[in-house]
From Swiss-Prot:
Organism: Drosophila simulans (Fruit fly)
PANTHER family named among the record's database cross-references: CYTOSOLIC FE-S CLUSTER ASSEMBLY FACTOR NUBP2, NUCLEOTIDE-BINDING PROTEIN NBP35 YEAST -RELATED
Family: Belongs to the Mrp/NBP35 ATP-binding proteins family. NUBP2/CFD1 subfamily.
Name of the protein in question: Cytosolic Fe-S cluster assembly factor Nubp2 homolog
Residues noted as binding [4Fe-4S] cluster in the record, renumbered to the chain: 188, 191
Record-listed ATP binding positions: 14-21
Primary localisation category: cytoplasm
Length: 260
């Protein structure tokens, strides 16, 4: 039930381990910080990490006449979250499903969740271009998807896989809003200087290759990692950090792009 959702954004990456779920959660929190009502849908069925990242493990979802009721992070219901992680008894329980069952679950997430009125729905996806992605794109064609944010790290091995994701978006007709380069440089926890421990500017070159906007470059910041397991936004806890600056600019760019 996405008829009350104004903007649907899919967060993608062809490579695992690039911090896509962290980007999704912190982007959702940043949008909430800016006064928007936000939904976060985690469709990584085999590796759901959003409940852990937001400290919501152990919370239950319920059914009402209108469908599943998502988990809310606060009493004001400004951030709604849905994940298969809420349906598992233990975090260690594996989801061993074949494609058709995964497809059915994702369709349920997209059609049977009572999101109410949302300014943004952020959909965090698993890496790759598998059944899950095809199902999401097919379902979103019926209700409309406003675009995809693609997350990469600067290393060439990640860029190769992310190029495939760009091709996937073009073939399925999904508009690419832009590319976020994550884990670019390491922020010293003592002096906060940033050192490039890997290659750099991979996201910039990828954006140039795909002819899409470069939405920002996020470093590895141990102070941000400490926020895992909470609903605290980087914008609140570390307002002067590079991560907060990039997320602030990202929110402004999204507002501009989706308003036009």
């Amino acid at each position: 039930m996405l008829d009350k959702v104004k903007n649907v954004i899919v967060v993608l990456s062809g490579k695992g381990g690039v911090g896509k779920s962290t980007v999704s959660t912190q982007l959702s929190l940043a949008l909430r910080k800016n006064g928007f009502k936000v939904g976060l849908l985690d469709i990584d069925l085999c590796g759901p990490s959003v409940p852990y990242l937001l400290g919501l493990e152990g919370r239950d979802i319920f059914q009402c006449d209108e469908g599943w009721v998502p988990v809310y992070t606060d009493e004001f219901q400004t951030l709604a979250v849905m994940s298969i992680g809420f349906l598992l008894k233990n975090r260690e329980d594996p989801v061993i499903w074949r494609g058709p069952k995964k497809t059915m679950m994702i369709r349920q997430f997209l059609t049977d969740v009572r999101w109410d009125e949302l300014d943004y729905l952020i959909i965090d996806t698993p890496p790759g271009t598998s059944d899950e992605h095809i199902t999401v794109m097919e379902c979103l064609k019926e209700v409309g998807c406003h675009g995809a944010i693609i997350v990469t790290t600067p290393q060439e091995v990640a860029l190769d896989d992310v190029r495939k994701e760009i091709t996937f978006c073009k073939k399925t007709g999904i508009n690419i809003l832009g590319i976020v380069e994550n884990m670019s440089g390491f922020v010293c926890p003592h002096c906060t200087s940033c050192t490039n421990i890997f290659s750099s500017n991979g996201g910039v070159s990828l954006a140039t290759y795909a002819q899409v906007p470069h939405l920002g470059t996020l470093p590895i910041d141990p102070r941000v990692g400490v926020l895992a397991g909470t609903t605290t936004s980087v914008l609140d806890e570390l307002p002067d950090s590079t991560t907060a600056e990039v997320l602030t600019h990202l929110v402004e760019k999204l507002k501009t792009m989706l308003a036009s």
